[in-house]
Structures are given as C-alpha cells and as structure tokens.
C-alpha cells in the first residue's frame, strides 16, 4: 500500500457471524503493517475481546424491521445518529479503505465513507446478498463474496464482484490440520451440536430428545458436545444424564469450538455463513438447520450450497423434530462411508486462504484509489 500510515476501517455488526470474518481479515492486514480500526454497534463489547484493532469505535445502529411505524421510525432516527457519528469518525481517521461485513450496523460507516469519497469494499458472506449490503452495493468500489454465486447482487454492481471466500480465524485453520476421525464398527461416535454465537433454543429442544431415542448400543458409543443457552442447560443435561451416553458436555459457549468441530464425526448446526465456512475449511459433515423466517432466506441458501456439494444434509426447521433427527443420526452413524465422503466434499468447498485473498483485495482497492 502506498498511502502514508495506512489505516483500514472495518465495519461489522456485533454478532459472531460478522465479527469472525472481520477478525480474520484484521489479522492479515496487521501482518502487512496496516493499522486496523473496528466500527460496530454496542453489542460488540461482548464478542470483541482480543479483536486485533488499535481502536474500536461504537456507532449507534438499529434494524428497521417489523410492522410498527413507531419502531421503524425510531430505528431510522438511530441510524441517522449513527451516520452523524460515522461522518465524524471517518473524517478523524482518514482511512484508505472502509470494509463492511454486512448488517445494518455497517450502513452508517459505509454510507459516510461513500459520501466522503473514501473507497469502500463490501464483503457478502452469504449466498444471498443482505439488504444492508444491497443498499450499499451501488456505491461500493468492490464487492467481495463468500460464495461463487450470490443472489441479489444489483446488476450494475456485478462487474465489481470478486469471489474471495469467507475469511476464517486462525483457530479454524489450525483445526483444519486435523484429519477426519476414523470410524469403526464399535468405536466412539462424536456429535457436536450448536446454534451459532447467539445460541439456538431449538437445538436444546430437539437434539437431546433425538439422542435419547437412539438404540442403546449406539447411545453407549456416543460422545455429545452441545452448546445451549443458560436457561436450557439443566434440561439438556438431565436428558443426556438418563440416556446412557459415553459422555456429554453441555455449555453456553465453547471458546475452543473449532477444535471441537475437528473432533466431531457429525455436526448439527445452523447454517450461518461463518459456520458454513468453518465446517468447509475443517472438512466436517453436518446436518444444517437454516434459521427460518428470514426475509432473505440466506441460511437456507448457504445450506443448499453445501447440500448440493454433498457436504451437508439440510433440514428445514419444520422437519427438525426429535423423531426425524433420531432417524437421521441412526442412518448416518450407520453409514461411515457416507460421513467420510461428506467430510471430503466439505473440505473441497472450503477456501482456507480467504482472509489473505480479501486482504490483497483491500490493498489493491486502496492503491487503485490513491493513483486516480
């Protein structure tokens, strides 16, 4: 990068799905000697511990959703306050590039940068472009995508699209060095269930009940690791305690989740972009249950990509009930060659160097802008 004292401003919503790829990019940029500042909303404090940024700027934000005119009006007022704060931040920081990772918290910083004629790069993690990124796409210098095909990219923005893949954290890359665990007729079976950085109650409602319905010889071989919300822990632990499992570990959050993915023979999870990217890079088969009710249906699209590749087994939440999950688990654990094939297919879809690809694109964008 040719600009003096280079600085890149990253804008990401305060959930793991947005912060994890931003963190992976920040590490690569820092390795290149580039200063990184993170702009996000108030939720970031709970998840940003150790984020590799020299500064974290809190920008007021809200999502204008729902049918209430008052609620939507209040959300737009908050976004307006965020835009004013973002204008001040962009002027003060004078970044070479502003990179957005989607979600409404990124709208004020990206829109401020575009109005101040600072180059902007959007990263769309999902197989369907989100509404915030769609709104910002026309003014973006470059659009990077996690999937090779992304629905909903504005036609005029398509020529500026570059497929980089979804950046994953160093812990995921380290876990990817672990081969798929061998399966034997009487050996251990490792099942991991989680619902993303914010948890998912449906996992606690369905997975323990499904496991309890498995044949006793299968349960005796089963080692379960499950993420559950704090209010669901006691119920899940009680069901597992009565099920006669080889072992069960239930907790609200696992800091070493990538390592636990690597140890799993099968994963049951939502299909957020970061989860899908991590499963692919590590190379683990999964039963994916897309989050229902989304206007964009992005998780369904993400799951469909892995399903089409033979790397995952998508299940709509309407079909995600204990009886059907138990049947899926029994069938898959009874077909080790099918699980191994899905693991290999998952690894083929992964892009382990996505963070480096995206970092190179950020630098190229800054250089192109500085030479105009």
From Swiss-Prot:
Pathway: Cell wall biogenesis; peptidoglycan biosynthesis. InterPro entries: GlcNAc_MurG, Glyco_trans_28_C, GlycoTrans_28_N. GO terms for biological process: carbohydrate metabolic process; cell division; cell wall organization; lipid glycosylation; peptidoglycan biosynthetic process; regulation of cell shape. Its main location: membrane. It is a peripheral membrane protein. UDP-N-acetyl-alpha-D-glucosamine binds at residues 15-17, 126, 169, 197, 299. It catalyses: di-trans,octa-cis-undecaprenyl diphospho-N-acetyl-alpha-D-muramoyl-L-alanyl-D-glutamyl-meso-2,6-diaminopimeloyl-D-alanyl-D-alanine + UDP-N-acetyl-alpha-D-glucosamine = di-trans,octa-cis-undecaprenyl diphospho-[N-acetyl-alpha-D-glucosaminyl-(1->4)]-N-acetyl-alpha-D-muramoyl-L-alanyl-D-glutamyl-meso-2,6-diaminopimeloyl-D-alanyl-D-alanine + UDP + H(+). GO terms for cellular component: plasma membrane. It is found in: Cell inner membrane. Transmembrane segments: none annotated. Coiled coil: none annotated. Disulfide bonds: none annotated. This is UDP-N-acetylglucosamine--N-acetylmuramyl-(pentapeptide) pyrophosphoryl-undecaprenol N-acetylglucosamine transferase. It comes from Methylobacterium sp. (strain 4-46). The lineage of its organism: Bacteria, Pseudomonadati, Pseudomonadota, Alphaproteobacteria, Hyphomicrobiales.
């Amino acid at each position: 990068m040719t600009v003096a004292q280079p600085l890149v401003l990253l804008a990401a919503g305060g959930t793991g799905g947005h912060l994890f790829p931003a963190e992976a990019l920040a590490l690569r940029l820092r390795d290149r000697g580039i200063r990184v500042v993170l702009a996000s909303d108030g939720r970031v404090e709970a998840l940003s511990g150790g984020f590799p940024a020299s500064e974290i700027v809190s920008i007021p934000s809200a999502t204008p959703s729902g049918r209430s005119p008052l609620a939507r009006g209040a959300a737009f007022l908050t976004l307006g306050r965020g835009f004013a704060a973002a204008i001040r931040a962009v002027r003060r920081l004078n970044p070479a590039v502003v990179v957005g990772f989607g979600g409404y918290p990124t709208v004020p910083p990206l829109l401020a940068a575009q109005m101040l004629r600072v180059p902007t790069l959007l990263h769309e993690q999902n197989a369907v472009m989100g509404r915030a990124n769609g709104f910002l796409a026309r003014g973006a210098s470059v659009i990077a995508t996690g999937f090779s095909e992304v629905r909903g990219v504005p036609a005029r923005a398509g020529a500026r699209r570059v497929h980089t893949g979804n950046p994953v954290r160093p812990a995921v890359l380290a876990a990817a060095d672990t081969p798929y665990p061998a399966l034997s007729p009487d050996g251990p079976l490792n099942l991991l269930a989680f619902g993303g950085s914010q948890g998912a109650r449906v996992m606690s409602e369905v997975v323990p009940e499904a496991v309890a319905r498995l044949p006793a010889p299968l349960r005796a071989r089963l080692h379960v690791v499950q993420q559950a919300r704090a209010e669901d822990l006691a119920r899940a632990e009680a069901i597992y305690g009565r099920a006669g499992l080889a072992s069960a570990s239930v907790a609200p959050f696992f800091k070493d989740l990538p390592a636990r993915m690597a140890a799993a023979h099968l994963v049951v999870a939502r299909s957020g972009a970061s989860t899908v990217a991590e499963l692919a890079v590590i190379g683990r088969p999964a039963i994916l249950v897309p989050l229902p009710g989304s206007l964009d249906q992005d998780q369904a699209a993400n799951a469909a990509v892995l399903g089409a590749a033979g790397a995952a087994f998508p299940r709509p939440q309407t079909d995600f009930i204990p009886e059907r999950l138990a049947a899926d688990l029994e069938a898959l654990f009874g077909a080790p060659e099918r699980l191994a094939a899905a693991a290999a297919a998952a690894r083929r879809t992964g892009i382990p160097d996505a963070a480096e690809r995206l970092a190179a694109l950020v630098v190229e964008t800054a250089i192109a802008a500085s030479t105009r």
